[in-house]
């Protein structure tokens, strides 16, 4: 590296206090100086004079570094961190108090442990470097697949419990893997885009094998949102219009498989489960259809404050209760036990957190961080919408409300929110350029009477 240019870069970087930002900024300055030097060389200057002129045109390195230090600084997300912790603590207390004096299948200590683990995972996600995760996106996808695949045959032997971890992993963490993979494969043309879509297709097939259509819907929506985010910026180099059409067509074709998945689940329910669990099949018939009339009747008698009339509830073991009161229908239990106002307060707090993170995501300039945040918002939004529909008596899929319902879901959602806050904190990091596309070069070519033999196979595009 030329001495004058390297000295200039080092002097400028000495003024930047954020060590994580230095490599990217140094690369940008170095590239600009080299371009200026090459322009000077083309004008007939010697090497030393060209370097000196390039450095002179860039100005004072101390002033440049000071200006960069003013712009590129970490932005701690203390307020969002406290808000997310408070909402998770509220969700833990709701789960604990609503099931404390009831015949719940989930012990109260489990809710406390889930809340503590969620706080730990939030802190862990916040401490992680999202840009470092992007560099190992392929390995993360492989590890994700290794964890998910062994869970597929387990549900055959214990379908009521063992599917839950796989469902939550696909529902919440799939958008993260897709966002990181899309960022990692950017700039690689059709192989990169098709590779990311192949990953989405594989995860969609896994959703049907578990089976759970909510996770399948998450795969479709995440692929559409994140795919369009990258193709509209032509980060794969295939053309904005063509890439956008391909992603939209892929998501549409994927959505057509929803009826196929529904028929597949119906076949399992009617043919397989009765043979495996003849005594429990009545309990398995989906509560979405079996208990919906009870839920609607209970909601019709709900008050703004105070419990509902016990005669509107189901009596089990001499205790009036809401169907699935300690799991997916916890919000219905909240309405019937405390009233509409506490329900609106809980949902409003989550909506405030969601909109706050959405606003920060829109303002975020860094592509990788923005993609991760879009994936997280998609995961949270899908869970929230379908859970609200279920708890208000309009069921489509069984879903748990983020940070309020479900211990496993709370832990994974808190981890993802921590990653989003990490992306907000590092939003001032310099943007990394897409990888250069590899162009196929003929092994033997004849141009203008010159025979060329290529032994490397591929070269980097300029």
Summary of predicted features, one role per range:
Residues 1-46:
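N-terminal, intrinsically disordered, low-complexity segments
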Residues 195-205, 214-260:
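Hydrophobic alpha-helical segments of polytopic membrane proteins
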């Amino acid at each position: 590296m030329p001495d004058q240019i390297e000295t200039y870069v080092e002097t400028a970087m000495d003024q930047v206090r954020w060590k994580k930002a230095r490599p990217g900024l140094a690369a940008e300055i170095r590239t600009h100086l080299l371009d200026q030097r090459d322009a000077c060389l083309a004008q007939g200057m010697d090497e030393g004079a060209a370097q000196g002129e390039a450095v002179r045109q860039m100005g004072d390195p101390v002033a440049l570094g000071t200006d960069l230090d003013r712009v590129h600084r970490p932005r701690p997300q203390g307020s969002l961190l406290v808000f997310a912790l408070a909402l998770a603590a509220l969700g833990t207390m709701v789960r604990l108090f609503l099931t404390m004096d009831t015949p719940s299948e989930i012990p109260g200590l489990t809710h406390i442990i889930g809340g503590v683990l969620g706080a730990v995972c939030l802190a862990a996600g916040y401490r992680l470097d999202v840009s470092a995760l992007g560099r190992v996106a392929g390995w993360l996808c492989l590890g994700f697949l290794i964890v998910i695949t062994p869970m597929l045959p387990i549900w055959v032997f214990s379908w009521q419990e063992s599917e839950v971890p796989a469902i939550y992993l696909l529902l919440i963490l799939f958008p993260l893997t897709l966002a990181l993979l899309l960022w990692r494969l950017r700039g690689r043309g059709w192989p990169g885009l098709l590779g990311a879509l192949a990953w989405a297709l594989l995860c969609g097939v896994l959703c049907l094998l578990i089976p759970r259509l909510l996770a399948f819907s998450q795969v479709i929506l995440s692929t559409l949102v994140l795919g369009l985010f990258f193709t509209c910026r032509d980060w794969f180099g295939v053309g904005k219009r063509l890439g956008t059409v391909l992603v939209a067509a892929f998501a549409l074709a994927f959505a057509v498989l929803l009826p196929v998945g529904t028929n597949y689940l119906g076949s399992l329910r009617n043919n397989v489960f009765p043979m495996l669990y003849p005594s429990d099949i009545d309990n398995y018939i989906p509560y979405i259809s079996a208990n919906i009339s009870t839920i609607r009747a209970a909601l019709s008698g709900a008050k703004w404050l105070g419990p509902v009339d016990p005669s509107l509830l189901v009596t089990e073991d001499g205790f009036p209760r809401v169907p699935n009161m300690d799991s997916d229908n916890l919000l219905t239990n909240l309405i019937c036990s405390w009233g509409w106002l506490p329900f609106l307060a809980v949902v409003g707090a989550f909506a405030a957190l969601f909109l706050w993170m959405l606003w920060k995501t829109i303002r975020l300039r860094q592509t990788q961080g923005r993609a991760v945040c879009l994936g997280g918002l998609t995961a949270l939004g899908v869970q929230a919408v379908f859970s609200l529909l279920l708890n208000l008596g309009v069921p489509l899929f069984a879903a748990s409300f983020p940070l309020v319902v479900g211990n496993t879901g709370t832990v994974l959602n808190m981890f993802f929110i921590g990653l989003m806050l990490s992306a907000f904190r590092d939003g001032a990091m310099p943007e990394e350029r897409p990888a250069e596309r590899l162009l196929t070069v003929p092994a033997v070519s004849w141009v203008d009477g010159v025979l060329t033999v290529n032994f490397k196979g591929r070269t980097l595009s300029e």
